[in-house]
Amino acid sequence: MLIKHTASVQWQLWIVAFGFFMQTLDTTIVNTALPSMAVSLGENPLRMQSVIVSYVLTVAVMLPASGWLADRVGVQRVFFSAIVLFTLGSILCARSETLNELIASRVVQGIGGAMMVPVGRLTVMKIVPREQYMAAMTFVTLPGQIGPLMGPALGGFLVQYASWHWIFLINIPVGIAGAIATLLLMPNYRMQTRRFDISGFILLAVGMATLTLALDGHKGMGLSATAIAGLVVAGVAALAGYWWHAHGNSRALFSLRLFKTRTYKVGLTASLLGRIGSGMLPFMTPLFMQVGMGFSPFHAGLMMIPMIIGSMGMKRIVVRVVNRFGYRNVLVAATLMLALISLSFPLVAMLGWIWLLPVVLFFQGMVNSLRFSAMNTLTLKDLPDRLASSGNSLLSMVMQLSMSLGVSIAGILIGSFAHHQVVTDSPAIHSAFIYSYCCMALIIALPALAFARVPADTTTNRTLTKEPGTGSTRLQQ
């Protein structure tokens, strides 16, 4: 139990918990503020997806290096640096006067965010006994669950009653306190490390960044066709280069032996495709409510809370659902249900049934959470122990990458159908959102074809179980 920890360990757990809170709060607080940011910066609200993409893509790129840095340099130094970078990025975001300045500032913020959560997990592993690890992780991740719940409403409140700058300024006092506490209270644990695959890291980083920028380049950044073609060629070449680099390389960042496990290969591919569609939802929903329906920022933020409550509630029963119906049936059904629910949301809103919107969003959150949890455990469940850590790291990176791709595609869709002409709550913008949601529903539904290839479940020797005191799952043999 946590009450058995010494005072110094308790303080260290609180430091990690606040790091989790800062990082997860920032993933949702910005979405509600995008239309107001656009007005302040003189930009089109339908071109603001780069503010989210820059942060999420940076997190995806930097994740593989964070654990190695913590082991090599020490968790205290890396965690302190993460908080400082995140806080500095927040200050730069608040001072931004152009969209390009804001995007660059979000990159700085993303570097800090990428190091905060994985290094926090390593810290907990080192400061508590193994038998108390799950209880400690439950304690430090609870603020991380509260962050997404507070984010949309808090962001809407600050935008409506202060200004969008305050969604970043509120990070400053928390960041300063966290940085000081880290220096004073957190030991600088280090572990012996193997040589970091810098070549593989650079190749993967270049591949992910260039392909995502190419996708967002024309609508979001105004790049020419020649520049976009160059980015695509560079991205494909970098990823092909990594495949050649990793072939037969025992020190590769991610071993190609991972893909010899069928469920991992199918699960990772389906997770990438599935999360592209799901990644559109947190961006599209508040944008539609404000630009499409004329909701105030605070009202739009409050409307997002049922979706997050539904997501958190489903985590309590997901184990029983998967064990009862099996991975393939659950994933195919949840994918198709999510597509239908997502498509129904704008239709219900335009029919004037505002009272029904929280119900739709609640079920959307439940189904999305069910699919996420099942995708994660399916992907990792058959990996041998020696590949489990590497497989989990690659899955985490793919999750972040697919979210950035989803936001980019959502921005392309709504920008194309609206022709970048924004008249709030007008028939033209309604049509643009309907067309965008139809395309989004199709993108969400397509991974059902991949999930249909998941092998039939054999639950005689494998049972999905829930870890005590957490929302996470594991497999019993």
From Swiss-Prot:
Subcellular locations according to the entry: Cell inner membrane
GO-annotated cellular components: plasma membrane
Signal sequence, start to end: none
Alphabetic keyword roster: Cell inner membrane, Cell membrane, Membrane, Transmembrane, Transmembrane helix, Transport
A GO MF label: transmembrane transporter activity
Residues that span the membrane, as ranges: 13-33, 50-70, 73-93, 107-127, 139-159, 166-186, 196-216, 220-240, 268-288, 291-311, 326-348, 352-374, 394-414, 432-452
Family recorded in the similarity comment: Belongs to the major facilitator superfamily. TCR/Tet family.
Name of the protein in its database record: Putative multidrug resistance protein MdtD
Originating organism: Serratia proteamaculans (strain 568)
Gene that this sequence comes from: mdtD
